[in-house]
Amino acid sequence: MGNQELELDELKELDEQIRYHADLFFNKNISEISDSEYDVMVNRFNELAALYPDVAEGLETTGKLVPITLDQSELKVVKFDTPMLGLKKVYTKPEVTDFVKTIKGGVVYEYKMDGLALELQYDQGKLVSAFTRGDSLEGEDVTHAIALFKPDQIPLTVSRKDRFDVRGEGYITLSDFEYYNKVSPVPAKTMRNAVSGWVRASKSNQNPLVKGLLCFGGYWASSNFGLNTYTEVIDELRTMGFGVCPRIDVNHITNDIRAEDIPVDGVVVKADSIDEHSKLGYATKVLNWAIAYKFPGITARTKLLTAVWQVGGSGAVTPVAVYAPVNILGTDNTRATLHSLKEFKDLGLTEGCDILVVRSGDCIPHIQKAYSDTGGKLLKPPRF
């Protein structure tokens, strides 16, 4: 079987696995794998989908919003007036420098929050609705979850009477997350996953322990409020009572400075001039006037426990490394999917050996290195 055939089989198998785990998590509130492992599958699916767009177009995972089922009905899904587009990701400092050179009027730097993207809609001075980002074109109505946020983060009323929308990231601080895990009979494992689950729970199933714990980091408004710069718009949002993304400087990129109590995975660099926003516009899925610099990976050494082999419905075989629990940037990890038999062989995994696990810019854990001499016999794939 050629490489293309193997990749096509893997693409179809990933489609099957993603839909299976999405249904478990969103509709049945069951997690068989960690959010990091799910991210691995989605990232690999996107890589292969870019190589084989014609095949990917016919798969259910491509471009679909998986709604959460609540009390035998789905959350209301609403189409956005303006798509909630993403940002182009860069991983090196020279890429940031090159981008800044293309921008007129200067740039601003903000932490890239790691939480749940939300849109808040205001009319006649009142908050009327809140939606998740969804698939960027359509989002889910989570207005009932506003009570989970701290009062000084999302105002219920504002002085302006015109209709406008505010977008930002819903998140929980590390200190509040630790507090929650101390008082909750069922501790949460990951901050981002927990926030998503809490906000997207039904009104009758809201977690009372979370009420007033969540924060909001605003980073966009549909109205410029007659102002000329992004800095002025964000200052206006802060004056109106919104929490906003922390403003930082280029040194946080130069020295890879992470926030101490806020979950972040990088720095967003934006054109400050509103005219530049209009001039540069956007591409198919990303804004042209902003980029996201992703912090380099954090590594942790742990011990390999075993390797298991998953066989999907299409017959594709996927090796999975199981290792002693390790926490990186607030996320507990115990498993890493190795995307191919070649990767499994190249690592040279041995029984009980030490491995180096890295959580990289996309918050995706994988095995970077195996210390083969610290283990026993070389692990070999089974015969199928």
Task: Locate the predicted segments by residue.
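Phosphate/adenylate-binding "loop-and-lid" substructures adjacent to NTP/NAD/dNTP-binding pockets
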Residues: 1-158, 275-289
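Flexible glycine-rich surface loops and low-complexity tracts that mediate binding to linear polymers
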Residues: 153-158, 162-177, 351-366
